[in-house]
Amino acid sequence: PALAGVCAEIEADRETLKAVMDQLGVGQSKLKPLAAVLAERLGRLKLNGRLWGYSPLSRLDELELLQIGVAGKRRLWRALEHTHADDLSSFDLGALAERATGQLMGLEAMHLKAAILAL
């Protein structure tokens, strides 16, 4: 349930990012979504101690990747807050950064539990 909540927030943040990009007149790359799908598929090839199927290490890897993504998102919100605050006054960039901090804290707790199970 906690992971589902974080994932729902991440999806909401993606939609906000699209709106921010529109506000700034930044086009969305056609290649980046394709690259993300490719990276996700390649990530499945990563050795997790099992030839087939899902292992506890798989969950650990997934949580680590989520943490990396959320940390990057938090840095983006902070950077936009300091560089485009006037252009993006309709967005609460500080609150978005704080939400990312909360997401990181939740993911860290989940990561610790997954590590205990995996190691």
Predicted regions and their residues:
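Inter-helical turn/loop segments and adjacent helix faces that build the functional surface
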Residues: 1, 24-25, 79-94, 114-117
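Short, charged, amphipathic alpha-helical segments
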Residues: 1-8, 32, 64, 90-98
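Conserved alpha-helical segments that form or flank metal/cofactor-binding pockets of metalloenzymes
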Residues: 1-41
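Heptad-repeat amphipathic alpha-helical coiled-coil interaction surface used
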Residues: 7, 14, 67-70, 74-77, ...
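Short amphipathic alpha-helical interaction/hinge segments
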Residues: 14, 18, 42, 46, ...
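Residues that form generic nucleotide/phosphate-binding pockets
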Residues: 20, 37, 41, 96-99, ...
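Long, charge-rich low-complexity segments
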Residues: 28-37, 104-119
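Acidic/histidine-rich alpha-helical segments that form the ligand environment
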Residues: 39-88
